[in-house]
Amino acid sequence: LTWQVGPDGAITGFEQADCAGEHRFEVSLRQDLATYPTAEFGPDAPMPNQTRQAQLREELCGAGTLRYLSGKYDPNGRYSIAPILPPADAWQRGDRTMLCGLQETDRAGEPVLTSGRVADQDQARVFEAGQCVAVDAANTLTDVPCADPHQLEITSQVSLADVFPDSTPTVEDQDSHLEDVCTAAAQD
């Protein structure tokens, strides 16, 4: 799916898009909240608030999205699992379809344009040598000017896929390999 965001934050042009091209949201599954086992989403029910939407994301979207990605999801990576509810007028007419999917967001948490299917992407947050990175309270990594407060300065990129081509390495295996590699990069 994709859409445009106006200067005032208004969303227009909400439409289906080919995941190979630019888009803001990749649908992983559809949930019909009308079949949810309570009257919470009945014909006269109000739309869920932000807190309830976050709960629904955890309850209904996580496992299905992980299956959609064949188990390959980096929860600390570029993409987050998110729900999209129908517009308010469609909700009032009885539409209870919740779309679960994946999106990449900017610093403000707004979905940004991305290209390609998530399953085919490197999900890691990658920074270039020389960039400085701040870590916020939610452990989100953001590149910042090095004159600003930051916790990391990138000295090198290392592809662990080259070293561990057949499996995901344990944290201990990563640390063992990276100790010498990163120390050498910092000294250079």
Task: Write out the residue ranges for each language-model feature.
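Primary mode marks residue(s) on the alpha4-beta5-alpha5 output face of response regulator receiver
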Residues: 1-188
